[in-house]
Regions:
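N-terminal "first-domain core" detector
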Residues: 1-24
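Intrinsically disordered, low-complexity regions enriched in serine/threonine
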Residues: 13-16, 27-218
């Protein structure tokens, strides 16, 4: 009734918890938040519903972005979305509905953030520094040239450019999809499929990018 439609679901495979009690992540799209209305070109907001693995009915609502060009989901981590990004609620329909409405209200603010990142052009030096910090979000100190090159690689024409937004998108997709060799460990970086790791990397990357963008502007 609120206009949200589930379009993707993910479940943690665990020997400890049954399927009913395992952690789930469900991504919802809203019929009123189309790309044209949102105004961020190839992306639009989503709502993520995450349950805790204890099976006690505790849930978490977070804001996300879905980028159509690469079918890739991002997770927002910004103080401006504190009322939505990590709200713990009981299994109560009214609480879920009220929180979901906040996602819609914050969509225009989120659009402004993305537009701001689109307007920031990075110098080659700034781009290298950002990619290094992005790599550290997943790999820590185990970062080599091959990782940096792959995180800054344009996988399609839409990814090309020196804006903060384009650079962020390249790094985010590379971190999540992997598919390259980590030269410091000689092991292949696999795609991220674990829900907790997905949340952590996306959250940390968004927060780091927000700080980096602010520093560049200053």
């Amino acid at each position: 009734e609120e206009g949200w439609v589930a379009h993707e679901a993910q479940q943690v495979k665990s020997r400890k918890w049954s399927a009913d009690h395992a952690k789930h992540l469900i991504r919802f799209r809203h019929q009123d938040l189309a790309m044209n209305d949102f105004g961020v070109g190839d992306s639009f907001p989503e709502m993520l519903l995450i349950n805790c693995h204890n099976g006690l009915g505790s849930y978490q609502l977070r804001a996300g972005l879905y980028r159509m060009v690469c079918s890739n989901g991002m997770i927002i981590a910004d103080a401006e979305y504190g009322s939505v990004k990590q709200r713990h609620i009981g299994f109560d329909a009214d609480s879920v509905i009220q929180s979901s409405r906040q996602v819609i209200e914050d969509a225009s603010t989120l659009s402004n953030v993305v537009s701001d990142w689109e307007s920031i052009s990075l110098t080659p030096e700034q781009s290298r520094e950002y990619i290094k910090r992005a790599a550290e979000v997943r790999f820590g100190d185990n970062v080599d040239r091959n990782i940096l090159a792959n995180l800054n690689r344009s996988r399609r024409n839409e990814d090309m450019g020196d804006s903060m937004w384009k650079t962020f998108n390249r790094a985010q997709e590379g971190l999540m999809r992997g598919g390259f060799v980590n030269g410091t460990t000689n092991r292949n970086a696999r795609a991220i499929t674990n829900i907790n790791t997905n949340l952590q990397i996306n959250t940390d990357l968004w927060a780091m990018t927000s700080e980096f963008a602010q520093a560049v502007k200053n």
